[in-house]
Every structure is written in structure tokens, then in C-alpha cells.
């Protein structure tokens, strides 16, 4: 059974304690009414994983756990089988005692692009909105964060996160809650807020920016990563039914337009830190994610376009500060 009591106890002692006015009731309602039909199967996979304390843990350069002596073939097979019961694995990679989870996305590449532009994360309390399986939460801890909290309503991601946590020695420096940003009160409590790969899924992107701002302390830093198109500050793509086969894509601005949106929402010191085209090496089908991936979403005759004829995915990282 996946429980959240450790997180409640943790925040009861710090500046997030006011979150306890709403959070336990929200989680209790989720446990009663909103669990996915496969949630028990997924949580059982987590339950059956062995409890291991890593002899060597690297969260600075990767998410890697090693034991002092190699695990037996039977132990490795058990871990591998249970983790495969949690497929598809989209965000990673993870290397856990010799079991290498080769995820759809090379999320480590994104982290390498983002990290040089961040304020020092040492001692910070961080919120990662739409955190997926929590890969970047662990990298934030590796970069020195005091506490990394992720929110994502996708319940498979919660189980993947808890599986990795268990194999990292039940590390309590990172936590994932099965919530969306709209369920959070205006906590104004996080030193850094990340929103990566979320904005284009929001029907009201400016509302999302305001919601992110409401989670930051004064002088806090926002890290925003999202799809963009080429163009000036007035350029925004509004796709039709689908973009790269995704139905729920609403607005894809240019990077200059996104900078203007952030300034309109009251952020300051806004800068475009990085823009890059997503490649089929960074997002691809693997044995841990066996369905279609980016190569299937691009025009086979012109890789600069999606199958719908839109510009192929490129992503920008913007950094901003709340005054």
C-alpha cells in the first residue's frame, strides 16, 4: 500500500505545514474514489520489490544504485520482472543494481540542458509540476536540494516513483503526490518551481503560469520547459485535432511570445536559456516502452514536420523570477 504519512510528518515541521489544511483530505478522497483499475496490480509490484539500501548511490550524474556485492541472478530477475510490470517507462533512465531501465525519453539530456542555467539548488525546497515518474526529482536531490516534491495525477507514474524510491533505500528527500496543479492552494512556499512538458497541455496557458507563480516564495525561480515554434513575440501555433499524434495540445507559442506571457503574469528577469529540436535519439521506442514514439509522429518524407504537417517538436527552457 502506497501511503503518504511520512510526507505529512515531514511538512508538519517546516514551512509547508499549512498544506496539511487541505492535502490529507484530498489524498483520502483520491484513495477512496479515484484510483485506476490497475492501481492495485501496480502497487503490488512495488510491494513485492525487495528492500535494498544502496552501497553506492549516484544522483548527481545519473540515477544509479549499486550494491556492495552483486545481486544473485534470481534477485535481478525478480526486480526486472516487477519493474517491467510497471511499463511503459517514459522518463528516465534508471540503473538499479544491474537492471537498466532504458526509458522512452532521455530525461538526463534535458537535465543537462537545464542545470547550467539554474540558481544553485543547494538547500532549496522544490516543486516539480507534471513530474512523470520523478526522474528529475532525484536529479534535483543530487544537485543539493533539501526537498523535492513532485505532483502528477498519472497513477502509473506514482507507482514507478515508489518502486524507484524503494530500491534507493526508501529515500525520503523526494516525494510524489497524485495531484494536478489546480488542486494545490497558493502555497507560496517553494524556492524553485519546475514545469517541464506541461504548458502545451493546458487549455489556459496563462492561468497555468499564474498557478506556478502562486507556489513560489518571493524571489523564487521558475523553470519553464515547453514546446515552441519559430517566430516573434506574436507567434502562437494553435493545432487542430492533433499535434504529433497528441490530442491534448492547445497552444504552442514562440519562445519570444512565451517570454512576453511570463512578463505579463508579473515575472521578472525572464530569459530564454535554451532552444533545441527534439531528436529521435532523445525520444524513442525501447524495450521498456514498446509502443509508438517520436519517429512515428514525424512525416516520413520530411522529418522537419509532424505527420499533421506542423513544425516538428522543438523545446525551449525559460528561466524567470517572482518579484
UniProtKB/Swiss-Prot annotation:
GO molecular-function term, one example from the UniProt record: methyltransferase activity
Keywords: Transferase, tRNA processing
Positions of carboxy-S-adenosyl-L-methionine binding: 91, 105, 110, 130, 152-154, 181-182, 196, 200, 315
Pfam families per record: Methyltransf_9
Domain of life: Bacteria
Reactions catalysed according to its record: carboxy-S-adenosyl-L-methionine + 5-hydroxyuridine(34) in tRNA = 5-carboxymethoxyuridine(34) in tRNA + S-adenosyl-L-homocysteine + H(+)
UniProt keyword Transferase present: yes
Record-level GO BP terms: tRNA wobble uridine modification
SUPFAM superfamilies on file: S-adenosyl-L-methionine-dependent methyltransferases
UniProt keyword Nuclease, yes or no: no
EC number(s) recorded for this UniProt protein: 2.5.1.-
EC supergroup of this enzyme: transferase
Family: Belongs to the class I-like SAM-binding methyltransferase superfamily. CmoB family.
Quaternary structure and partners: Homotetramer.
HAMAP family to which the protein is assigned, alphabetical: tRNA_carboxymethyltr_CmoB
Task performed by this protein: Catalyzes carboxymethyl transfer from carboxy-S-adenosyl-L-methionine (Cx-SAM) to 5-hydroxyuridine (ho5U) to form 5-carboxymethoxyuridine (cmo5U) at position 34 in tRNAs.
Protein name: tRNA U34 carboxymethyltransferase
